[in-house]
Structure formats: structure tokens, C-alpha cells
Amino acid sequence: EIKPSYNITPSQDVLVYDGKLHYMKWAYNPYWSKKKLNLINCRIETMSQKPSFKKAERCVFLLNGWYEWKRENNEKQPYYFTNYKLFFMGGLKNNNGCCIVTKQAKGELSLIHHRQPVILKFHEINNWLTGSHSFQTKIDNEIKILKVSKKVNNTANNTKDNIVKKK
């Protein structure tokens, strides 16, 4: 059963696809690590060289948007990034969990944060899973950025109100 969520945080279960649709813990731990690293992101530029990801498999996160915070007037302000549709992010996984693959942010997205997820279109999913694509998708231009309430800082607030544009 797919459950809507409006405030997923690291270490919670996220919906992923890796040939089948299922939930996984959003916190990646290398198979060799004796202590929990709980990695939530991986840079696409270095993922093939980092020992942490040597045996990782690819997966795809399914979502409608994500949050980033920007420091404004000495406070952190949350923003919601969306295209108002289901979209997909490149990820890595193992038996211990999963993480989002990021790249250098482009355009308006870079005004909020210097990194962004690798965003995929539906027809790119199989190429991502097989590792045969450079992922220069134009979907980045379709992402809208909404200033939202600071209520998202509390994981107990998990309602549609979180993704309403702040006035």
C-alpha cells in the first residue's frame, strides 16, 4: 500500500523502484562499515570512486517534491521543490538502505542550494537502473520553488499544509 507523506526525513521509509516497487530506509550504510553512517546523499561526480558505494545498486525514488533550507536573515527558511506531478530521482541502495544521488544545482535551484537530486523522466528510469545514461535531463527547468512554512521542521507535521506556498 502506498501511503502519502508530506514530511519524510532521513531514516524513514521511502518509496523506491529497483525492478519492483517497495519501501526502503532512507539511510545508506556501506556493507563494510562497523558503525552506522546513515548516508542520505551521494555525489554523482564521485559515486564510482567512493568505497562506500562500490557495491551499491541503483534505485529510483518516487516523489512529488523535496525540501531544501536556505539561510535568510539569520534563520533557516524551508522551500519545497516540485513540478506538481510524480517524478523520479536517481538513488543508490544496498540491503541496509538507500540514498539520493545529487549533482551540481542549476538555474533557479542553485539560488537555494548548491546541490540537487539527479531528476529523471519516466523514460529514463531503465537507463538509470542499468547505468547507461549521462542524465542531462531538461526536467530541472520544470521544477517550481515554493517558500513554505517552517512547520516542516517538525516531523510530526505531516500534512498537505506543508506544501502550500507561504504568503
Ranges and model annotations:
Residues E1-K167:
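Short linear sequence motif anchored by a di-proline
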